[in-house]
Regions:
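Short, Lys/Arg-rich N-terminal segment immediately upstream of the first membrane anchor
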Residues: 1-5
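Solvent-exposed, non-transmembrane regions of membrane-associated and secreted proteins
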Residues: 6-215
Length: 215
């Protein structure tokens, strides 16, 4: 009897190992697909930026462009993580499967919140950021706005009020594995921006980026 019980435990253990391996593989494939989709969209976004930074209306809405039937307000670059990603204009679960999204706000009003899934190729490594790391948001006029990380916190997944609270110039967030909490990165503006008439900083960044180079 003990012999058969041992076989049962071994079988159950094997099932758990197989299920875990399947889940890891599934998540890896899903992350890779999300990365490829984002890369394709990034190319279309950067191609629609002007060759020189143009004037913008700080009191108006961020300009939006269409790429493959989706709307984008620009890009977000996190050099320390090797990320350069297109930002969709509106958050939706389906939108977040292919790129990060504006949750609310505007870079012009210093209250932009950007959300993304925890895919490795999206915002999965936000937890690895450090204070003073650089974050760059570029609008569709080619103008880049520079920020630095000032705080990293973990909030409950339903703590919407806390997510939107405070006078932060830029917030990035993603869910933890399992979705119970949100890794939340708060940033402040450094005051640095690209100048009108300059070649957009993001064009050079795109040329060097793995997200463009591998295409």
């Amino acid at each position: 009897m003990k012999k058969y019980s041992g076989y049962i435990y071994i079988a159950i253990g094997a099932i758990f190992i197989f299920a875990a391996a399947f889940l890891v593989r599934h998540n890896f494939n899903e992350s890779a697909e999300a990365g490829e989709a984002s890369d394709d969209l990034l190319v279309g976004v950067v191609e629609q930026m002007p060759g020189r930074v143009v004037e913008y209306d700080e009191s108006g809405d961020m300009p939006v462009v269409d790429v493959d039937g989706r709307s984008f307000i620009g890009t977000v670059e996190i050099p320390s993580l090797g990320l350069l990603l297109p930002i969709q204009s509106e958050w939706a679960p389906e939108n977040a499967k292919v790129s990060v999204c504006r949750y609310k706000g505007s870079v012009y009003d210093n209250n932009l919140i950007v959300a993304g899934h925890n895919y490795v190729e999206h915002f999965g490594n936000l937890k690895n950021l450090h204070t003073a790391d650089e974050v760059i948001v570029t609008d569709m006029n080619g103008k880049s706005f520079y920020f630095e990380v000032t705080d990293i916190e973990t909030l409950g997944s339903y703590d919407i009020e806390e997510m939107e609270a405070g006078e932060w110039d830029l917030t990035l967030f993603t869910c933890t594995i399992g979705g119970a909490n949100r890794v939340t990165v708060r940033c402040e503006s450094t005051g640095k921006t690209s100048e009108t008439g300059e070649v957009p900083d993001v064009i050079e960044a795109a040329e060097k980026s793995k997200h463009i180079r591998k295409k």
